[in-house]
Amino acid sequence: MSATPVVSVVVPVRNEAGNIEPLVKEIERALTPEGPFEIIYVNDGSTDATSAELQRLAATRPHLRQIRHRESCGQSAAVRSGVRAARSPVIITLDGDGQNDPAFMPAFLAELRKAGSGCGLVQGQRVGRKDTAFKRW
């Protein structure tokens, strides 16, 4: 990938082999109209086929990269590793289990462009979640 990406998408994962390809395709559908982008999966010590699946997909997708933690360091550390590796100053983080819909990303990018250079963060909140009271706390 030669052009600087418009956005870097950081996806921390651990043992999510079955979710990787569907999420990659959703991200691609959402971001292809936006210009060059990169997807950085941070494999946080997976013990399943996550690494092999990422390697398979990356073979035909120059915009897809994998960073590997040899052992699980936790989601925050995985996000930090991905952010450090990002080539774009604009970074979106997504959970690797498909809970966040990548279709929202163009709207976030539009809000960021509308806000101008003084904006450092655009944030969203999922609605209609079915979490327990403890998780909401």
PLM-predicted stretches and their roles:
Residues 1-29:
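N-proximal low-complexity "stem/linker" segments adjacent to membrane-targeting elements
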